[in-house]
Amino acid sequence: MSPRVVEHTSDVAAPIGQVWTRVVSPEGINDEMRPWMTMSMPRGAADLTIDTIELGVPLGRAWIRLFGLLPIDYDHLSIVALEPGRSFHEKSTMFSMKSWQHERSLTPITESMTRVYDRVTFEPRWFMRLSAGLLRRLLAAFFAHRHRRLARHFG
């Protein structure tokens, strides 16, 4: 099965530095995902920041929780590329995904407006392959939700 791709772009009414700080913080990530899901930080990674992690080295399992309560998946998290203040590329495996890549980039439009671009490339594990089309639609809706939440945060 070939990997599936989901892309989403939106403009956020805030300077790029403020948007970057928000999108790489655990609070910002979880705020984007709520109320549907939350994601824990991997054990031992609580004191790390996007600026202090070692690229390409797995950080450990980040648990994905439905409604913030019920563990439904994990993300064996690894950041493989980083342009501080601009972009990151996560390359991971999950219980449900043989391959998961999340690329997020920020581009300044003006001093007070930032374009946020997400590209998710995923390949479900064998037991999820029949639902790959549904997963793609759910992920597209979920990333649209995340972008709305991020834009709403900056008002």
Predicted regions mapped to residue ranges:
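Hydrophobic ligand-binding cavity/cleft-lining segments
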Residues: M1-E54
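Short, surface-exposed coil-to-beta transition loops
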Residues: V5-E7, I72-H76, K98-E103
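Generic structural detector for well-ordered beta-strands
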Residues: T9-A13, S78, S105-T107, T121
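Short strand-connecting beta-turns/loops that link adjacent beta-strands
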Residues: P15, P84, I109-M113
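Hydrophobic pocket/interface hotspot
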Residues: V19-V23, I29, A62, I79, ...
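Glycine-rich portal/gate segments that line the openings of hydrophobic small-molecule binding cavities
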Residues: M41-T93
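Beta-strand/loop substructures that line and gate deep hydrophobic ligand-binding cavities in soluble
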Residues: H89-A141
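Short, linear, compositionally biased motifs with a strong N-terminal bias
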Residues: F154-G155
